[in-house]
């Protein structure tokens, strides 16, 4: 299959620039790929799609205020660093601007020198490995100096940074939010749990590769970015019990899907506690091993995320659903509306 097979027309005005006032008031398009049905609904009705005994699996990663603005002490030139992932200790892979001025050994100061970065390796496409030095606790220093790294297609400033976090965000480490989870409120999750649905959490730290366009025509030539994931023994046991009792594993978002399917692929369909790095690329032809249904936002044309949804529900039907969403003025991308896929 080619990248262009996953293209569709998307009017720019449908790209949501701000979150809705209430998280769960977004629209929800419920699709069933076997029955070939589509139903327009609202997100707080997602509870009606969940059965007692099902497991709802969510990614509890937390977005770091990963964009830092500093200057070189020798030239006072302005520098921007975007933290991508913690490689070891105080070393991070970052995206640097302007990268060409930052050679190995270069230093950058942030916040009157409260945080310092030394370039220790140069990567391609403006990437660098830096080592930070600071007093105190790194995350506290970062909270005071860093800014939330909103996706490149969002041009308006976010009034409340917590609206780019899920209500259950816990594990620091992402450069972007797992946006399918932004629709849930604490109250809605309580109602879902009261219905007899198991709430299960895993972690996948979302990298900026999630926004990287597919630059090749042939999907087999695309290199997926790697992201760190973790599933605890308690969570794995709950999911095994749910499967054994005939319940469904319902994933919230593509990051939860990629984690569960990475583990399912690694353990021949079994669900085991595990952690590591995944670069799984789920595209049409992939056989799902763990996930039975999922919710997700509406994604960019020609993106790996549209390909993932198509792997589950079929490309033609997914593109038909996307055309319906465009016609019905659904809001797209991170702050947009959601889809529930049976």
Curated annotation (Swiss-Prot):
Q: Which GO terms describe its molecular function?
A: S-adenosylmethionine:tRNA ribosyltransferase-isomerase activity
* Keywords recorded for this protein, A-Z: Cytoplasm, Queuosine biosynthesis, S-adenosyl-L-methionine, Transferase
Query: Quick one: a GO biological-process term for this protein?
Result: queuosine biosynthetic process
Give the matching InterPro entries: QueA, QueA_dom1, QueA_dom2, QueA_sf
Which pathway does the protein contribute to? tRNA modification; tRNA-queuosine biosynthesis
Keyword Transferase: yes or no?
yes
**Keyword S-adenosyl-L-methionine tagged:** yes
What EC identifiers does the entry list? 2.4.99.17
> Domain of life, per the record?
Bacteria
* Protein function: Transfers and isomerizes the ribose moiety from AdoMet to the 7-aminomethyl group of 7-deazaguanine (preQ1-tRNA) to give epoxyqueuosine (oQ-tRNA).
**What does the record note on quaternary structure?**
Monomer.
- According to its UniProt record, which protein family does this protein belong to? Belongs to the QueA family.
Output this protein's name. Answer: S-adenosylmethionine:tRNA ribosyltransferase-isomerase
Which species is the source of this protein?
Streptococcus pyogenes serotype M4 (strain MGAS10750)
The taxonomic lineage of its organism, from the top, reads: Bacteria, Bacillati, Bacillota, Bacilli, Lactobacillales
């Amino acid at each position: 299959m080619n990248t262009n097979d996953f293209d569709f027309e998307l009017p720019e005005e449908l790209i949501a620039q701000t979150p809705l006032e209430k998280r769960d008031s977004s629209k929800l398009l419920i699709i069933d790929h076997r029955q070939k049905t589509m139903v327009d609904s609202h997100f707080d009705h997602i509870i009606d799609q969940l059965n007692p005994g099902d497991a709802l699996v969510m990614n509890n990663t937390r977005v770091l205020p990963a964009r830092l603005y500093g200057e070189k002490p020798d030239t006072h030139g302005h520098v921007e660093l975007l933290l991508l992932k913690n490689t070891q200790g105080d070393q991070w892979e970052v995206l640097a601007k302007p990268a060409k001025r930052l050679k190995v050994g270069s230093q950058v100061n942030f916040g009157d020198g409260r945080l310092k970065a030394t370039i220790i390796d140069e990567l391609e496409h403006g990437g660098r490995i830096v080592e930070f030095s600071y007093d105190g606790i790194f995350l506290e220093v970062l909270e005071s100096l860093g800014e939330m790294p909103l996706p490149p297609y969002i041009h308006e400033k976010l009034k409340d940074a917590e609206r780019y976090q899920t209500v259950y965000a816990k594990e620091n480490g992402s450069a972007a939010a797992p946006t399918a989870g932004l629709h849930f409120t604490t109250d809605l999750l309580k109602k879902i749990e009261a219905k007899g649905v198991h709430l299960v959490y895993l972690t996948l730290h979302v990298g900026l590769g999630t926004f990287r366009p597919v630059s090749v025509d042939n999907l087999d030539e695309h290199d997926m970015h790697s992201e760190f994931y973790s599933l605890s023994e308690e969570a794995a046991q709950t999911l095994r019990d749910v499967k054994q009792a005939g319940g469904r594993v319902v994933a919230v978002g593509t990051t939860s899907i990629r984690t569960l399917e990475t583990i399912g692929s690694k353990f021949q369909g079994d669900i085991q506690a595990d952690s590591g790095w995944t670069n799984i690329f789920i595209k049409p032809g992939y056989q799902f091993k763990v996930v039975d249904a999922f919710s997700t936002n509406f994604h960019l044309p020609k993106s790996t995320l549209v390909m993932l949804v198509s792997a589950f529900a079929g490309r033609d039907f997914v593109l038909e659903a996307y055309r319906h969403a465009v016609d019905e003025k659904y809001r797209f991308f991170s702050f947009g509306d959601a889809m529930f896929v049976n």
